[in-house]
Curated annotation (Swiss-Prot):
Organism placement in taxonomy: Eukaryota, Sar, Stramenopiles, Oomycota, Peronosporales
Intervals of motif RxLR-dEER: 44-60
Protein's organism: Phytophthora infestans (strain T30-4)
Expression induction or repression: Expression is induced during host plant infection.
Domain notes: The RxLR-dEER motif acts to carry the protein into the host cell cytoplasm through binding to cell surface phosphatidylinositol-3-phosphate.
Alphabetical UniProt keywords: Host cytoplasm, Secreted, Signal
First and last residue of the signal peptide: 1-22
Family named by the database record: Belongs to the RxLR effector family.
Any one GO CC term of the record: host cell cytoplasm
Principal place of residence: secreted
Protein name from the UniProt record: RxLR effector protein PITG_08174
Length: 197
């Protein structure tokens, strides 16, 4: 179905391009025979083609107060939407903001040169939504490094997996600190994360 729309848009673009180029060529090749045949100079042409777009008085519908008040009464009978359902249908802006912050934090982590810089960046994350978004971003990488990892892995099991992995010591320590912070964010359940590594 979408390929038909794409084809339709491509054909419409091609046709409009050909029509425009043809119109440009035909306009450039046609020139008025004398100055009176030009539209700008031919005042009679302009006078004869003026149109009145105003609505005639008898074409307007008469204003009816009874009909207007009946419509207002009908509006008063309308049922208002349930605010709880409306709130559930709206996006969670805190989570969206958390993803934005997590993207910035991931960029900082990628550009950090030393272990201390990375540790300071991870310790600087105080928002639970940001920590959760960071974890979701790095989850595929974590599964590549630790194939036995899944969502039910405890901190002790993860500690054993990290120790037995072939990561260097700085990366092992950083991974443990980050996972402790993530686990603390799940336990905290508040908007701010004050768990020390």
């Amino acid at each position: 179905m979408q390929s038909r729309y794409i084809l339709l848009v491509a054909v419409a673009t091609l046709v409009s391009t050909q029509e425009t180029s043809g119109a440009t060529l035909s306009m450039s090749s046609s020139s008025p025979l004398n100055e009176h045949e030009s539209i700008r100079i031919n005042h009679r042409f302009l006078r004869t083609h003026t149109e009145d777009h105003a609505v005639e008085e008898e074409e307007r519908a008469p204003w009816d107060f009874k009909k207007f008040s009946a419509n207002l009464a009908d509006l008063g009978k309308l049922k208002l939407p349930d605010l709880a359902k409306l709130k559930q249908s709206l996006p969670d802006w805190d989570k969206i903001a958390g993803y934005g912050k997590a993207t910035g934090t991931a960029a900082k982590l990628a550009s950090a040169k030393s272990f201390d810089e990375r540790l300071a960046i991870i310790n600087g994350v105080k928002d639970i939504d940001e920590m959760n978004a960071l974890f979701l971003m790095t989850k595929p990488l974590l599964k590549n490094v630790l194939p036995d990892y899944d969502d039910t892995t405890s901190l002790e099991a993860l500690l054993r997996m990290i120790k037995s992995s072939d990561l260097d010591d700085d990366m092992k320590a950083l991974a443990l600190i980050a996972f402790q912070r993530y686990e603390g964010s799940l336990k905290a359940g508040t908007s701010k994360l004050d768990v020390n590594p």
